[in-house]
Curated annotation (Swiss-Prot):
Biological source species: Homo sapiens (Human)
Residue ranges of every copy of the PDZ domain listed in the record: 48-131, 148-234, 248-332, 456-545, 557-641, 656-738, 941-1023
Descriptive protein name: Glutamate receptor-interacting protein 2
Regions of compositional bias (Pro residues) in chain numbering: 1034-1043
Biased amino acid composition, Low complexity: 384-397
Stretches with biased composition (Basic residues): 422-432
Amino acid sequence: MLCGLSRETPGEADDGPYSKGGKDAGGADVSLACRRQSIPEEFRGITVVELIKKEGSTLGLTISGGTDKDGKPRVSNLRPGGLAARSDLLNIGDYIRSVNGIHLTRLRHDEIITLLKNVGERVVLEVEYELPPPAPENNPRIISKTVDVSLYKEGNSFGFVLRGGAHEDGHKSRPLVLTYVRPGGPADREGSLKVGDRLLSVDGIPLHGASHATALATLRQCSHEALFQVEYDVATPDTVANASGPLMVEIVKTPGSALGISLTTTSLRNKSVITIDRIKPASVVDRSGALHPGDHILSIDGTSMEHCSLLEATKLLASISEKVRLEILPVPQSQRPLRPSEAVKVQRSEQLHRWDPCVPSCHSPRPGHCRMPTWATPAGQDQSRSLSSTPFSSPTLNHAFSCNNPSTLPRGSQPMSPRTTMGRRRQRRREHKSSLSLASSTVGPGGQIVHTETTEVVLCGDPLSGFGLQLQGGIFATETLSSPPLVCFIEPDSPAERCGLLQVGDRVLSINGIATEDGTMEEANQLLRDAALAHKVVLEVEFDVAESVIPSSGTFHVKLPKKRSVELGITISSASRKRGEPLIISDIKKGSVAHRTGTLEPGDKLLAIDNIRLDNCPMEDAVQILRQCEDLVKLKIRKDEDNSDELETTGAVSYTVELKRYGGPLGITISGTEEPFDPIVISGLTKRGLAERTGAIHVGDRILAINNVSLKGRPLSEAIHLLQVAGETVTLKIKKQLDRPLLPRKSGSLSETSDADEDPADALKGGLPAARFSPAVPSVDSAVESWDSSATEGGFGGPGSYTPQAAARGTTPQERRPGWLRGSPPPTEPRRTSYTPTPADESFPEEEEEDDWEPPTSPAPGPAREEGFWRMFGEALEDLESCGQSELLRELEASIMTGTVQRVALEGRPGHRPWQRGREVRASPAEMEELLLPTPLEMHKVTLHKDPMRHDFGFSVSDGLLEKGVYVHTVRPDGPAHRGGLQPFDRVLQVNHVRTRDFDCCLAVPLLAEAGDVLELIISRKPHTAHSSRAPRSPGPSSPRML
């Protein structure tokens, strides 16, 4: 691994906690000592390590070397469990250059040891190490994949040593490579990360171009749990790639680790055979590159699978400790399944890597959105393994449109001379919406009506091949340009093509901030050559966008040109999507093919791709279908009528209201979610407040814009920010639905139309029983259906409000209570947050986790008992906040906002919740006091020991019917779970310190199965369920699996 990893001469004595003595090298050891004391400059990296030790303790490292020993001082051993080892900042073989600023070059071994012993509590080591290897060589048999790994911090580290990073000297720039995974650490326990993996991002923060110090600082700033995106290499053996018959595959794994494959049975020639169903990303099997989903398993360690059942094959595979020999029949590449295994991304090895500081990055990923795959797949590569999709954040690659089409518009004509086409465009270099009037449009090439937009493009290249971009302008190279130069050619598979934002015919307005119009063509080309030496260039580009006719509603088709390995530029979102609901286009890359058509907008719903319907298609499959399209892609689009500015067809009116606050509050409470296209509505009005006195604003009205800033595609937090900085005059654009009641609906948000309003067929599909979409796992069933008598649920995100009380001027104490306690019932919607702006609102949080529940300072009217109730109620809510039950808090608020205690199961998506009048119970304040003053939720930590006879824990789990969640279904009498106090309907929030609040049984059952002999659970329980004698109802014939 590192140069310092070399043997010590026999007979060396350990002179102390820091000492590693050694005899002077002689004879054959001289060359070894020379190698130890010098790392070539081009492979040398420097880092600073800071360690804080307790008084009387040691660092836990052994130092060898010194002027009287065999070379420079270096780390020869790290004591397991010691401070240095747990810091994950040092490797064996690292050279120590200085300690607290004192250089060790001229110190003897004993002097170094004395220095370390007396250095004090704070130790700063300057460390020299060998840089990790550079980018992998171009090899068509090596592909790079990425995987998202969630790790829990242990101390200040995650259990791995990170080296490399960007450097001022380009020759020393390296990827951020894991050079050591500490045994027993968080990364080792999780099992996915291996030495040599490259770190791409942490919690969505990209690290390409980051130095080693920056990367370490990012890791230190992470919270207790962090999401790492890691790249790893997979080498496909030639024998597998060219296989035409059965193969024998031998895989060596660490004892105790899992292979990472799951088996299934399929039918082949009317005979049941065992095949590979899925391969876990970054597992031993995945990294081997020898096995693929769909491969037919002929034998396992010499045992034929011809007459084995699936269960027997799975047990046989799990019983093998170190070396596994599988005889397989590889599935043909053309028959490999469309669905890949989890979050895996395939790239061409000859392309630039994301850790390289020269890789183009034109867009920041959004959490919760799936973007298109980052890299292209080589010709002939298996497409079933080239998909990237994660529920967190995946980076976007911007590909280019076909360079054979020289227009900036898809299917356009040849560009004219810059002298005849650029003169009239220069003065219009500003951003436009694609819905601009014809007054701001021009006639582009081919007679098409267009308007111009500008964007900034960052390209990364190298001095040899440059950026793959050629410019054209003027007649002579030394002639002063009267208009910007044109992009006249884009080299295939170059950075200019891969970025996806450039097309032939685009005008380059500036290069690295230097305008091109006042210079010469030679100067522009020189700027590009100089930028290539620095590996990076920033271009300001002007391009044409078609003035297309955009339907305000309804369904239509869009045809886009598509080139293999070049994406369309659309981002698909499914953060809150349920089965049967369409995918949403959440973002369109400016300058991409999709953007230049002028037809697509964020918020559009994607119904089909090339006539393949996406009703029940997972987002990963939709991305894969887009990737496999070539030449021409036909998209079926439905406009988002709720977000449409054209309101005639939606039965709604919009108008603008101007409010002058004069230092006072607006008197409104807004409600919404952090989903970009969920509506933001007015959920409460202060009695006799400014907004209510206008008579133009009502509860349930939807806010379309604040001070002329559209809220389309913006979450609630941005709307809150706009109100905070709005000033004295606030202009609200309001949308009011006329053909629907203005009072809050029982089914969710007032202003969000369900799919049933737009597509009756989709509505029928959306209303089917949940069992129709139940996963094919025999041990999973639903228990939430039996919870219909509960009013709240721990751990679910329900409706909520945030109503700061501090600055409500001119109102009674009753009005200064939280907005959901007032008379006007605002609309309720799962996971919604409300916000009431006030004149003193400077830094209100976006969520309700710091709500002020203190009673009013002035005396409140009414009996003292009511005031005491609200004080006790506020204290109870504060207790819920402190124990992490803010989402339960929102659910409690929902019940009081509507004045009812709901008896229906909760559903995470608005528009489908079956609120029925017959299932409501009116609640008086006295009843609510009785309901809410006792603890509404019990939290229990349960430790169970596996039954040695039955090898289980004596309980089964089931899914939530309408929400994600894992619940205890049945408890076996006298079993471990029964003796431990577990009860049916308990919700499992943690399993062995892993949060399962948002899991379903597909994720939780393997976690429970791998728990070993001791299982630690944190469960939530409603007090009244402890006395319920009803057994949970099974939704289907399948029986739950006993764990």
